[in-house]
Every structure is written in structure tokens, then in C-alpha cells.
């Protein structure tokens, strides 16, 4: 049984699937559970001077705080004792950093599975990249493409 779990949550359908699947697994409710939402700043948002206005950063942090609060509430309704964490940065780096810092034994993420190879290649995958850097086991909840 896992004693400490980190769930990465971004509010997408796949993220919600991951929350539900983890909540339904026997024994997860007894684990020390942490929910992480990461406010990311896409490179397209950077201005020509190479920085982001503070207002844009604050907007993204506020948006992700709402997503985090939603996820924490959903898990608490299912009987979890959960601690929420908000980070700013690249999702892979922040997920791995917090998992190491907390000594997690499992990371739970959602993943949108594309049907076409070109779509998978173009978008990349947090789940696949996470496999290369995670300090512990990973549970990937799959959300299949409806196209």
C-alpha cells in the first residue's frame, strides 16, 4: 500500500479521470495525499523583452488556484485527507520536485491519448516525459480521444 501519493491536477477531463480512478482504488484513502496544480507560462506569452507582466502571472496563478481548490474539494468529498500545493513553472520539473521533497511513493497523472501518431508527436506528453524523471512509480489514467 502506498503511504504518500502526489496527484498532479490541471482541471482537464483527463485530470478529473485520474482523480476518480485514484479515489476508487482500494487503500488510496488511507494514504497521505497531496494534490499539485502547476501554473505554467507558455513561451508564447513572453514579451519581446523576455519577461511576463506580473498581471499575467497572477491571472494564471489565480486560475490554477481555483482548479486546485476544485480538486481538493472533490477528493475531500470522497473521504480523502488531502493537502493542496500550487507551483509555478514547468509541470514535469514541479511534479518531480514536490514528489522528491515529500518522499512520495506514487505520482498520479491524467493523459489524453491521441489516435494519430502525428498528433502524439506534435503535442508531446507530460506522462511520457515524467517517466524519465520521476523519483517513484507513476499511475497514468488514460482519457481516450473522442475524435
Annotate each PLM feature:
Residues 1-51, 133:
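Small/aliphatic-rich secondary-structure junction motif
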Residues 34-36, 83-87, 139:
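General small-molecule cofactor/ligand-binding pocket signal
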Residues 39-41, 112, 144:
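Residues in the short beta-alpha loop(s) of Rossmann-like NAD(P)-binding domains
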Residues 50-54, 101-103, 125-127:
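Short, hinge-like loop/turn segments at secondary-structure boundaries
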Residues 52-66:
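A short acidic, glycine-rich active-site loop
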Residues 73-107, 145-147:
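Structural beta-alpha unit
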Residues 109-132, 147:
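Glycine-rich, Arg-bearing micro-motifs that act as flexible, cationic patches
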Residues 136-147:
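Short, flexible loop segments at boundaries between secondary-structure elements
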Amino acid at each position: 500500500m502506498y503511504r504518500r501519493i502526489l496527484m498532479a491536477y490541471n482541471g482537464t477531463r483527463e485530470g478529473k479521470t485520474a482523480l476518480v480512478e485514484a479515489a476508487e482504488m482500494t487503500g488510496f484513502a488511507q494514504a497521505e495525499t497531496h494534490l499539485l496544480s502547476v501554473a505554467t507560462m507558455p513561451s508564447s506569452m513572453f514579451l519581446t523583452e523576455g519577461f511576463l507582466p506580473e498581471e499575467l502571472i497572477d491571472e494564471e496563478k489565480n486560475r490554477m488556484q481555483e482548479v486546485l481548490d476544485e480538486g481538493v474539494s472533490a477528493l475531500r468529498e470522497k473521504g480523502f485527507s488531502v493537502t493542496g500545493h500550487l507551483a509555478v513553472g514547468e509541470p514535469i520539473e514541479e511534479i518531480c520536485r514536490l514528489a522528491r521533497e515529500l518522499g512520495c511513493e506514487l505520482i498520479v497523472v491524467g493523459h489524453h491519448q491521441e489516435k494519430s501518431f502525428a498528433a502524439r508527436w506534435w503535442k508531446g506528453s507530460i506522462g511520457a516525459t515524467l517517466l524519465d524523471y520521476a523519483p517513484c512509480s507513476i499511475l497514468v489514467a488514460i482519457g481516450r480521444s473522442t475524435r
